[in-house]
Amino acid sequence: MTLLISSLFGDRPYVVVLGIAQDGGAPHAGCEKRCCIELWESGKEEKVSSIGIVNPLTKQSWLFDATPDFPSQYRILTENHNTELVGIFLTHAHMGHYTGLLHLGREVMGKKNVPVYVMSRMKRFLETNGPWSQLVSMKNINLKLIENNKYIKIGEQLFVEPFLVPHRDEYSETVGYRIIGNEKSLAFIPDID
């Protein structure tokens, strides 16, 4: 499902909703509830929660969370919207939010220096735990340290503001993002307690 907010045919940045489900997608593995059974039987699925920001003028895009559905979400963002992925913002270290980074490594895409925006605990987690640390050491990803409530400029009149949110923080802090444009803004908070 792709939902576009703002003008699809204009020059203004817009949001692409790439997924709405929890960490394991829908249907979840092993789920025997009616909602899952209906999805299994129909062949339909919901991708894990993620959004993309597209700047049609520069043909650049940014991904918010690298989910287990990264291959199809990357394709939607780059091919369907004719952009180059120039950055990934991670929210936290639970399986549905960062495991897609593996596709950037040498076994799949072999990318070089993809900017990945993270707060300090998430940065340390990725640097000190394999296989993520290999992505760092081989320079597939370039970790960009961000701070609570400090704006990051990603385009002309386009900013991202990270902010801490309460959640289970076993391995990293949990971050929400406010994406601020010239006329509109939105918040991306895939998990919160």
Could you describe each region identified by the protein language model?
Residues 121-131:
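A short, active-site helix/loop in glycosyltransferases that binds the activated sugar's phosphate group
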Residues 30-33, 77-80, 102-106, 130-133, ...:
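Short, glycine/charged-enriched secondary-structure capping and boundary segments
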